[in-house]
């Protein structure tokens, strides 16, 4: 499963990556899935592979930015052999490839965004985002499982934002610690 859905995506992307960088233009659309974004019973390996594609997209979006190479992910909802018989026939009939095609065409357009997960199906479109709460810093004495449990509401709710790079999480957390400890940081 990972060989096809994750490594297949890696290999296809690698073939065109240097060409797009050299010409300073490129658009890549990878395929993810709601099974990767949200989970789906019985599809652990498929979901893991499809979420791995998102990690690849996030990193390549940073690497391709200065070359005008944009990469996005499509999370399609479509009637397929995998979904046939699992959903109502009328609903299945709405989930045609034609209702997903406009999303792909937009993601490869000159004005496409980058690092975006575009969900599409049955003529509906939405952007899926990975967000992190503001969270909070805990004094050393409270840095325990019990301290986390006691502060769970503040840790888990509020201030959701989509981080643009992994280092932003570290900067945020160090900033919270410095503030909590009354330290000046540069």
Positions of the model-derived regions?
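Catalytic Tyr-X3-Lys loop
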Residues: 1-10, 25, 29, 53
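Active-site helix of classical SDR
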Residues: 13, 49
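Active-site-adjacent segment of SDR/Rossmann-fold oxidoreductases
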Residues: 19-20, 38, 54, 59-70, ...
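Residue(s) in the substrate-gating loop at a strand-loop-helix junction
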Residues: 33
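Conserved catalytic-site region of short-chain dehydrogenase/reductase
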Residues: 36-38, 80
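Active-site loop-to-helix junction immediately N-terminal to the catalytic Tyr of the SDR YXXXK motif
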Residues: 39-47, 87
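C-terminal helical subdomain
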Residues: 73, 91-183
